Amino acid sequence: MPHCGTTNSEINLNSNELISYQKKKSNEDLQKKHDKKCSINLKTSQVPDGGFNNQYTQLTANKIEQYNCNDLDKVCIVPSSRSDGMEASFSELLLSPNKLISQPWQTAEEIENWQNDSFRQRNEMFSCIYTNSMLNQQPCSQQQLLATQLLYARLLRSQLAEREFHSNKFNMVHYSGSKKTMLREDELLSTPSSQDNNNNIKLIKDIENSISCVDPPLFEFSNVHQRAEQKNKQDDKNCYSPKLKSNKEALDGYDLQHTCDFIREQKNILIDIKKKLDNLSDSSGKFRKRLSVRQSHIEVNNGSNSALEESVRRQLNGNRKSIENLLEEVKRLYNQWSSAELYYVRSLQRLGLPSEEDGEYTSTPTHTIMALAAIALSNESILPQKTNAVHSKIPDVESESDFFLTSAKPKTLVEIEDIILQLASSVNMHQSSSASTPHESYSDSVKSDCEESNSAPTCIWHSTRQTFRHKKDVEPCSTAAEIILEYASLSSSSNIETSRLLTSASNLTDVTENYNVTTQLPIVFNYNRESSAESIVTDPLLVPEFSTAPSTPSTGSNSGCSTGMVSGIFGLSQNRRKQRLARHIETLTTNSFKSNAIRGNVDNEITNQLKTSPSIRALPTENVSHLITKTLSSANASLTAQELSITNLFKERLCALQGNAGSMKTEIFPMIDAPYDLSIGSKTKHMNLEAKHTSNAQSNESKETTNDKKKPHIKKPLNAFMLYMKEMRAKVVAECTLKESAAINQILGRRWHELSREEQSKYYEKARQERQLHMELYPGWSARDNYGYVSKKKKRKKDRSTTDSGGNNMKKCRARFGLDQQSQWCKPCRRKKKCIRYMEALNGNGPAEDGSCFDEHGSQLSDDDEDDYDDDKLGGSCGSADETNKIEDEDSESLNQSMPSPGCLSGLSSLQSPSTTMSLASPLNMNANSATNVIFPASSNALLIVGADQPTAQQRPTLVSTSGSSSGSTSSISTTPNTSSTVSPVTCMTGPCLGSSQERAMMLGNRFSHLGMGLSPPVVSTSTSKSEPFFKPHPTVCNNPIFALPSIGNCSLNISSMPNTSRNPIGANPRDINNPLSINQLTKRREYKNVELIEASESKTIVAHAATSIIQHVAVNGYHANHSLLNSNLGHLHHQLNNRTENPNRSEQTMLSVSNHSVNSSECHKESDSQAIVSSNPPNAGSSDNGVISVS
């Protein structure tokens, strides 16, 4: 952009130029006629050369002037100071479409392509006109300024699609940014003053001048970038097939003395442009806001809409999007320049060269080459990846930029740096192995320079298909070959020490670890760069091939891109720090890079390397190496001169390197620009990973087993009584002095039964809510999960979902029949054992339902044996709310499952809930007829003698099977009509009875002996000739029969009235706490009454006196059996019975009625004695002759 002057002379000059162009508009028709005439005259007339040229120049100049005048008339509307003029220009400007503005430039495209001077004059004129208008409209309003700025915004965005098409077509790689979005390529200025588009010092001056001018941001932005675009175009035209010149000519082409300053200046310009674009966006937003406010005001007042304002609103919305796109483009360019600066600094660090910021900085050609390469690579990292079709169109020649763009992912900083180093090492490898057999990868693609003399290597940042012209007045551009030669010169002089370096490098590469370099920040280390930087970094034989892709098998030479993670000895000596997102790039083994690579074995080594390498070798690499080696082979003389000149610059460093070369065999070179890595070698790491994998598997298995064992214990939901206990326990503990749990539970149980139905219903509702919540929290939970054995649960995991076929078979008797149909339960269910039906359905081989089962020793138990076995287990105390001696059911029964009777319900644990039907446990009915004389021991505290008034010959055989409790509890006999037998598994079956009095005496003695020893009495069998019932019916008091003892001989026994032993009502389950029926009568205390002795006139009364004295003695002494007293009384009683029962014909009738005794203890009694309640069936006339009695 020219200097935007502010003096009057410059303003007048610009105005004169405008007037002169406007005057030439009148010659438009005349020039059209001359056009036709001149075309005819050129063929027929003889015109001198000078005249012809003048005429031709005049005609073309007139055409350009004509189009420029049209542009100025249609586009550049200079606002005037009058308000009418401002409104008119404002309206016309905003309503003019984009096509109308850009149409004149599109029609003049062909002429402007070859008229660069006129093209520059038009842009300069355009700039002067705009500057003049800006100076004249200082007192104008903000809307005028905004309108002009919006005009240029539309102008700049009009050709975006066309520019993108040209950019993609020619594969342009620009220094200052790809895809310039300001102006078309055909409109760019031609300034042949620069040899490169990034080292033009005049451009910097123009930028500084443009910043000093008070120009709008958009015009400044467009002017800066149109100059940059024109430089790119001029470089494209000037780029030619390079001839390798002498050292002086090569060094004179680089004049970037302050590369970092130049890059930073570009960044500053972009920052300034961004700020001004933001200001423009703010101004546009304010204008849109004011317009919307005015529009709403018009709609309210007039109810009409202005077409002009609607058009302005649409244009403003479009301009807003254009400004946003420009801001994104500026940000992208800024990031690109920032990347270029970073690449440049990092490259200097890796080469060990000082930067501009250091005090010892001296400009060298290497600095210039690194700067150019950094700018090109920064642009390459931002460009999108090209498709494979683009590469397939040009298989013969591949540019370096095409090689860069084949990576699937954006390259990191070190990857881009290593690309340059790999190319340099490829050149050196070709030089070092030129005397020997070349590389297999290179020999296939290398062609002689004579065969390809016409095909020139392409420029690193220019088109691959353009024809380059030779211009003597233009400095040559830097090409890829020149950049590679500069790097090759750095290591060419170090070939003398190659064998030593290979030996040390082979030692280093044995411990090479997989690494990936993702560090983006320049890190400077205070190592001695003088001794190991230059000649080692690019030595070809020390540099293996790397791949950016993971370790995958190779699918072909062109299946991917090997970006060449080559960093020489620095990439092999140390390990880089692995970032969290780093990909592990497997490093090739370096056994093939021994000294025999120089001695003619290069072919075999590279072949083996390619076979065992998991990396992917890419075709673009071969093409580039072919391109480089082909160029080098044709200019050995120029290359030698260039190498000698570059070697002089690093003479001191090479001397230091030669001095330290002897120690390289044993020393490990430090990593210059990479942090320290704490990882281990690849083999060790692989072994550790395998060991870690196995240990993890074992630990996971152990964790699973421990998790199974440590599963949380889920408690059952509390029932109504437990909720009541939880609520009232604290109160009872506070009232009672005793803190024993059993006593407190007795009190709570008694109080629970004293509650009314309404009071209990509250807790039943709470229990229902508790169950519902438990089901929601733990779906699928079962009580088996807590109480079932883990091994059994694992072996048989049943499906809890019931099916139509066998769903009912998986239920137990309690869930299948309910509490009201206990007669249909199996025997184990009535005894709170495992259900036979359930076990059969679960296993298929359970016990049969006929009542027989197996004990723990495997022997089959009959009904009688099973009753005895169960009775022994149920003989314990039940004073607490939880039956500790009871095995829990393992099924998920109904949540209203009953609990054992709490509190002081002594003896209730041996009772089964009554029913209207006879229990299956006692299938025999009681007969009410008179029975024979039977001495019936009930427990260790009481003796029952049952007599019969029938003769012995008429007595029927009976079998009495009893099982007494080992605890010191009092048993009783009671007959209650319409009640079932007790739960105590005692049954009486028919059998032979003892017919003689001697046998009866023996039975009585045996009972007393067992009673004294605290043992269960054995089975006693008595036989008679005739079957008679045990008891004789008598009138009842409160539904309880009173046994009236018949006369003994000629005397009679007077028996006191028995207490009222009322049973719970029909349908009430005394063991079911959740049953709302009142069972408080079961908790009533009963007092023990002394046994009244009945005087008898006959000699048989001695037996009753003896038995009664024993019972009284035992009861008074706290229910403890006195062995000595029992033994003495037994002997006396046995002797008397033997003497007085010799006459078998006498009718002996003796009946001793022992009343029930209840312990009158307090609520907090220390001992909880179990009480046994014996119930018998009522007399039935039509019942069978068999009888049953149950005693515990």
UniProtKB/Swiss-Prot annotation:
Family annotation (SUPFAM superfamilies): HMG-box
An example molecular function term from Gene Ontology annotations: RNA polymerase II cis-regulatory region sequence-specific DNA binding
Compositional bias segments (type: Low complexity): 898-915, 957-986
Entry-linked Gene3D superfamilies: High mobility group box domain
Main location: nucleus
DNA-binding region(s), chain positions: 714-782
Entry's localization field: Nucleus
Summary of the knockout phenotype: Flies exhibit a segment polarity phenotype and altered expression of the wg target genes en and Ubx.
Coiled coil (UniProt feature): none
CDD domains membership: HMG-box_TCF7-like
GO cellular component term of the entry, any: chromatin
Polar residues composition bias: residue spans: 1140-1162, 1170-1192
Biased composition (Acidic residues): 862-871
GO biological process terms held by the UniProt record: canonical Wnt signaling pathway; cell elongation involved in imaginal disc-derived wing morphogenesis; chitin-based larval cuticle pattern formation; digestive tract morphogenesis; embryonic pattern specification; heart development; imaginal disc-derived wing morphogenesis; mesodermal cell fate determination
Record PROSITE patterns: HMG_BOX_2
Record keyword Repressor present: yes
Extent of motif Nuclear localization signal: 351-357
One Pfam family hit: HMG_box
Region annotation Disordered: where it falls in the sequence: 691-713, 790-812, 847-916, 955-986, 1136-1192
Keywords tagged on the record: Activator, Developmental protein, DNA-binding, Nucleus, Repressor, Segmentation polarity protein, Transcription, Transcription regulation, Wnt signaling pathway
Entry function: Segment polarity protein. Functions together with arm to transduce the Wingless (Wg) signal in embryos and in developing adult tissues. Acts as a transcriptional activator, but in the absence of arm, it binds to gro and acts as a transcriptional repressor of wg-responsive genes.
Similarity section: Belongs to the TCF/LEF family.
PANTHER family noted in UniProt: PROTEIN PANGOLIN, ISOFORM J, TRANSCRIPTION FACTOR 7 FAMILY MEMBER
Subunit structure: Binds to the beta-catenin homolog arm or to gro.
Name of the protein in question: Protein pangolin, isoform J
Organism the protein comes from: Drosophila melanogaster (Fruit fly)
